[in-house]
From Swiss-Prot:
Keywords: Amidation, Amphibian defense peptide, Antibiotic, Antimicrobial, Immunity, Innate immunity, Secreted. Expressed by the skin glands. The keyword Secreted applies. Belongs to the frog skin active peptide (FSAP) family. Temporin subfamily. This is Temporin-1To. It comes from Rana temporaria.
């Protein structure tokens, strides 16, 4: 599930 969280953070950036 870490990948999903990182993906969301990258989306914000």
């Amino acid at each position: 599930f870490l990948g999903a969280l990182v993906n969301a953070l990258r989306g914000l950036l």
